Amino acid sequence: MEKLREELLQANVGTVKENERMASHTTIKIGGPADLFVEPKHIDGLKKTMEIVRKYNVPWRAIGRGSNLLVRDGGIEGVVIKLGEGLDDLYIHDTEVTVGGGYSLIKLATVISKQGLSGLEFAGGIPGTVGGAVYMNAGAHGSDMSRIVKKAQILFEDGTIEWLTNEEMEFSYRTSVLQKKRKGICIAATLEMKKGNHDEIVAAMQKNKDYRRETQPWNYPCAGSIFRNPLPQYAGQLIEQAGLKGYTIGGAKISEQHANFIVNAGGATANDVLELIDYVKKTIYDLYGVSLQTEVEIVGRK
């Protein structure tokens, strides 16, 4: 790992750190150290990082702003690549928006709404990056990324870069081809918007932001929705009906605002959260015969 670190530093790919605690890079503020943590300063730095990582044949994963992510207390083996500055270009041409994978999704929704472009109102208040949103087909309020992504530019682990069409991305509920078949990083996406009334678009997005703030926990760190909705039922409703709001294990607590959120109420470990997830799963299955599936991505050494 030391030789890998030295080569990354010599290549001047960006920031390179050893044993970086992932708690500093996840929205739930939990997570052990990554063996190596790389934050490329530009697309060439990202491509070079992937090339070097491939050469040493070590495991890797990409993150954005760390939402929808729970890192185990043992940390992450190999290399964590964080997308952000330097991968956040934005081009708007008529109703077509091409944006870097490191661009903030909330910021993008705000910018294009002010341009009178409709289609991303659902993202008002959703944390994370565009790349992460494409990766997991993020959505809310009856819509998701699959409805607006025209194509996505993917850097695959073999070093090739391809534009995949919406169909090739194989979007489904909170997932895409990048989770199912082909490991890669969404470095850019072209979104197809619609022209609309500026005031109506801004109002709709603000309404969604306000709704999230009123119904979801903002006063404690959290990862976002913990469970996928077992449609037509909703995970949060089942958990609330089971009387589990406020249930706590260690520093992990089921939010009293929205039962499908687990918050870090203070000093929580990943193990606290995982124990709470297991307890909720067992309770809901015993009461209702429903097997809840996690939406939050759980990674790291067991």
Curated annotation (Swiss-Prot):
What is the reaction catalyzed? UDP-N-acetyl-alpha-D-muramate + NADP(+) = UDP-N-acetyl-3-O-(1-carboxyvinyl)-alpha-D-glucosamine + NADPH + H(+)
Record's Gene Ontology CC terms?
Answer: cytosol
Names of the cofactor(s): FAD
According to the UniProt entry, its GO molecular function terms are: FAD binding; UDP-N-acetylmuramate dehydrogenase activity
Metabolic or biological pathway, per its Swiss-Prot or TrEMBL entry? Cell wall biogenesis; peptidoglycan biosynthesis
User: What Enzyme Commission number(s) appear in the record?
Assistant: 1.3.1.98
Q: Which residues form the FAD-binding PCMH-type domain?
A: 30-196
Instruction: Name any Gene Ontology BP term.
Output: cell division
Q: Which InterPro entries match?
A: FAD-bd_PCMH, FAD-bd_PCMH-like_sf, FAD-bd_PCMH_sub1, FAD-bd_PCMH_sub2, MurB, MurB_C, MurB_C_sf, Oxid_FAD_bind_N
Which superkingdom is the protein from?
Answer: Bacteria
Q: Which residues form the active site?
A: 174, 225, 295
Q: What class of enzyme is it?
A: oxidoreductase
A UniProt-annotated Pfam family: FAD_binding_4
Question: What SUPFAM superfamilies does the annotation carry?
Answer: FAD-binding/transporter-associated domain-like, Uridine diphospho-N-Acetylenolpyruvylglucosamine reductase, MurB, C-terminal domain
Keyword vocabulary terms for this entry: Cell cycle, Cell division, Cell shape, Cell wall biogenesis/degradation, Cytoplasm, FAD, Flavoprotein, NADP, Oxidoreductase, Peptidoglycan synthesis
Q: Where is the protein found, in the record's own terms?
A: Cytoplasm
Spell out the family assignment given in the record's similarity comment.
Answer: Belongs to the MurB family.
Q: Which NCBIfam families match?
A: murB, PRK13905.1
Role noted for this protein: Cell wall formation.
Q: What is this protein called?
A: UDP-N-acetylenolpyruvoylglucosamine reductase
